[in-house]
Amino acid sequence: MKMDSAVSEEAFERLTAKLKARVGGEIYSSWFGRLKLDDISKSIVRLSVPTAFLRSWINNHYSELLTELWQEENPQILKVEVVVRGVSRVVRSAAPAETCDNAEAKPAVTPREKMVFPVGQSFGGQSLGEKRGSAVVAESAAATGAVLGSPLDPRYTFDTFVDGASNRVALAAARTIAEAGSSAVRFNPLFIHASVGLGKTHLLQAIAAAALQRQEKARVVYLTAEYFMWRFATAIRDNNALSFKEQLRDIDLLVIDDMQFLQGKSIQHEFCHLLNTLLDSAKQVVVAADRAPSELESLDVRVRSRLQGGVALEVAAPDYEMRLEMLRRRLASAQCEDASLDIGEEILAHVARTVTGSGRELEGAFNQLLFRQSFEPNISIDRVDELLGHLTRAGEPKRIRIEEIQRIVARHYNVSKQDLLSNRRTRTIVKPRQVAMYLAKMMTPRSLPEIGRRFGGRDHTTVLHAVRKIEDLVGADTKLAQELELLKRLINDQAA
């Protein structure tokens, strides 16, 4: 049930007045001056801004405040969404994306003809081909108006996905599923896992979008695990659970993102039934999470077993060439909105070399440059390092030194570092020395001869014997295994 438009605008005016009082006039003008109310339903408020950068900033810094203020206006509000104006979503047929040369918005569609839904996140893993004015709309759902899908961002397509060695196999499997549909049973279910910001969401949404383009009437649903839980809980509350489950079982392709967040015994039980029904009916299922199926310990064992029965593919961090291509595309996208933007190729290359973490870290770096460029147009590489130091440090591997390992092991076993380097063969010295050699081999790139030299000029065979000795003991000695884990944590904490 939607609020009357006049009432909605009055509520929005009251909210913006409160917001301005809370954050101050200067911050309000900078970040909320172009905020507009798009829609208010029974439990969801949708606000819009003109750019993806504004949306990301508001979502990252003011989402909780906006939700709090709207709930003061209406306690029934459960969620506040901030979207980019002119970009919409979701589950049935996809309109072709427009380029920045043809970015005029299409004529409005009446609510009876189409249902338009909010977009997902912007740059979120390797999704850098933003296109203004593009739209993905959904055919009206059943007479109840029920909508199954989570936001599907039209910028997340195979064309805008930056491929490379770290994701090429997963991309090939994703394309096969999107093109072959239910005939791609050898990939069923397909499970894609990766750390945050490496392109899982982009890849999953690209599958859904391509499947819709391939077959206009395809029954495709993209869901996040959290959205599934929310919809299921809402359906139970409204005595509509049976209808909700029947709708989900009557689809051709189910795409589930962030599976690690699926919680609750009853909800997992229902999801297990859904998974079994779809797989047994040769319907395609694609799932993504931040770890492999076997490591999702919070999931019901039956769900894990089903997920392990398909193909699991890992997406790794992007290499330098991929990172540079992401930045180039992101700059081209930003220039569609502001042609005066100019970040030199040498700056982009430097950022690609130094920010080696996830795509989201790369986006954060780019947004920093974009923000600074407006009042520091001739930014230098030294200044870039200063601005992005927190990101470059986070992306660098920790440097672990053998001397630090020796110091921490000696302190733990209450011996001196000189004892570790000496020729003494007493039991109280031999064990710590072997542990230190083992950790040096496991935690540093040093060769066996180099480690031997650092331990009083010992031969490499002595180091090899120590490593094998500890490896043999650790399987049967729980106390030793715990000691090694503790020592590893201490060493990592001290690493630069």
UniProtKB/Swiss-Prot annotation:
UniProt keyword list: ATP-binding, Cytoplasm, DNA replication, DNA-binding, Lipid-binding, Nucleotide-binding
What SMART domains does the database record attribute to this sequence? Answer: AAA, Bac_DnaA_C
The ranges of region (Domain I, interacts with DnaA modulators) come to 1-76
Q: Which PROSITE patterns match?
A: DNAA
Q: Which InterPro entries match?
A: AAA+_ATPase (IPR003593), Chromosome_initiator_DnaA (IPR001957), Chromosome_initiator_DnaA-like (IPR020591), Chromosome_initiator_DnaA_CS (IPR018312), DnaA_C (IPR013159), DnaA_dom (IPR013317), DnaA_N_dom (IPR024633), DnaA_N_sf (IPR038454)
Listed binding positions for ATP are G197, G199, K200, T201
Which segments carry the region annotation Domain II?
A: 76-150
* Disulfide bonds listed in the record: none
Recorded GO cellular component terms are:
cytoplasm; plasma membrane
Q: Its Gene Ontology biological processes?
A: DNA replication initiation; regulation of DNA replication
**Annotated region Domain IV, binds dsDNA: where?**
374-496
Q: Which SUPFAM superfamilies match?
A: P-loop containing nucleoside triphosphate hydrolases (SSF52540), TrpR-like (SSF48295)
Q: Which CDD domains match?
A: Bac_DnaA_C
**UniProt remark on domains:** Domain I is involved in oligomerization and binding regulators, domain II is flexibile and of varying length in different bacteria, domain III forms the AAA+ region, while domain IV binds dsDNA.
Q: What is this protein called?
A: Chromosomal replication initiator protein DnaA
| Species in which this protein is naturally found | Brucella abortus biovar 1 (strain 9-941)
> Source taxonomy lineage?
Bacteria, Pseudomonadati, Pseudomonadota, Alphaproteobacteria, Hyphomicrobiales
